[in-house]
Regions:
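Flexible mid-to-C-terminal extensions adjoining Fe-S/redox cofactors in radical SAM and related proteins
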Residues: 264-319
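Local cysteine-cluster metal-coordination motifs and their immediate loop/turn environment
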Residues: 49-59, 255, 279-288
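Radical SAM enzyme [4Fe-4S]-AdoMet core and its adjacent flexible, acidic
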Residues: 1-5, 102-106, 115-118, 134, ...
Length: 319
């Protein structure tokens, strides 16, 4: 019996084999005109274990599940690929702590590179930055005294590892809160020349009684400062439109473009907070959500930000 595929099914099958630029263009057409809701970017919390106890982070406090095996990790990565994911970010906890038998996070990255256009990793910077991911984010949340207050005396080691690394695509990611927001301009100036660029996000209140979340008035001051610094040539990677949109969250969130994997291997589709805390869209400060949503709306600046940060199509000889 001959089975005829619909135009939609044929398009979907062909997309699995496309190079990055054709895949993303076809992805856009499929989602816009066929009303598909296919995720594109996934964050994989490969472990909740961490060697630090950061003030703003709820994940290290959670009882770590049994370590997922390398075999399970490979199956999860394959599932993400089948779902349509083409950009992967490995997270924790501290992802460099993941280990199963002889396998380490380096092996996970090698497998992931065979499946995704771009593989990134977010780290606290206390381990050598020798991993061959396309992009490395190091969390830096203040100048030395402030960072150490938030991130348990890890500033010197993080900066040392950044400066020792030969990786060409290291970004600093700043989580902005009531402790550090007034020194963000000084931090940006300190980091300039040490990293490829700087991305930001605002602290999200996962816990009850949280006191670290900024008011929108404070947020606006920070964002205006970042816009001024970006105009002056400092390496703020987030787009102008993203920074402006975060002032009052006047952007249309496309959370269906996202997927999240928990340390136990379960997969959630949608908002980063889903299954991790109470979803409060009004106070969202995840600039990555903002940027990908703006890119879907065909804002060229946001599209170019994604291409620059994720280095689609780059080979490991480039790293």
């Amino acid at each position: 019996m001959t089975v005829r595929l619909s135009i939609h099914e044929t398009l979907q099958n062909e997309m699995m084999r496309l190079p990055w630029y054709l895949y993303l263009f076809t992805y856009y057409l499929k989602c816009r005109f066929f009303k598909e809701r296919t995720p594109l970017l996934a964050g994989f919390k490969i472990t909740s274990r961490c060697n630090l106890s950061c003030l703003h982070c709820p994940f290290w406090e959670r009882n770590p599940p049994k370590v997922i095996t390398f075999h399970q990790v490979k199956n999860i990565l394959s599932t993400l690929h089948e779902l349509g994911i083409r950009i992967l970010i490995l997270e924790g906890g501290e992802p460099f702590l993941w280990k199963e038998g002889k396998h380490t996070i380096h092996d996970v990255v090698e497998v992931a590179k065979s499946l995704f256009f771009s593989v990134g990793i977010t780290t606290n910077g206390t381990f050598p930055l020798t991993i061959k991911a396309h992009t490395i984010w190091v969390s830096i949340d203040g100048l030395k005294e402030t960072h150490n207050q938030i991130r348990e005396n890890s500033f010197d080691k993080a900066i040392e590892n950044i400066q020792k690394s030969s990786h060409p695509n290291i970004y600093a990611n700043i989580t902005i809160n009531r402790i550090n927001y007034q020194e963000i301009p000084a931090l940006v100036k300190f980091l300039t020349g040490k990293i490829k660029g700087i991305t930001i996000q605002f602290h999200y209140p996962y816990k009850k009684g949280d006191t670290l979340t900024l008011s929108f008035e404070q947020r606006k001051v920070v964002l205006d400062n970042l816009i001024t610094l970006k105009k002056a040539g400092y390496p703020i990677a987030d787009s102008y439109l993203c920074l402006e949109s975060l002032k009052d969250n006047s952007w249309d969130c496309q959370d269906w473009m996202l997927a999240n994997v928990e340390p136990d291997g379960s997969i959630n589709l949608g908002c980063y907070v889903k299954g991790r805390g109470k979803v409060q869209c009004k106070i969202c400060g995840f600039a990555a959500h903002t940027e990908i949503s703006l890119a879907y709306k065909w804002h060229i600046e946001s599209i170019l930000v994604g291409k620059k940060i994720f280095r689609y199509g780059s080979t490991m000889q480039d790293l």
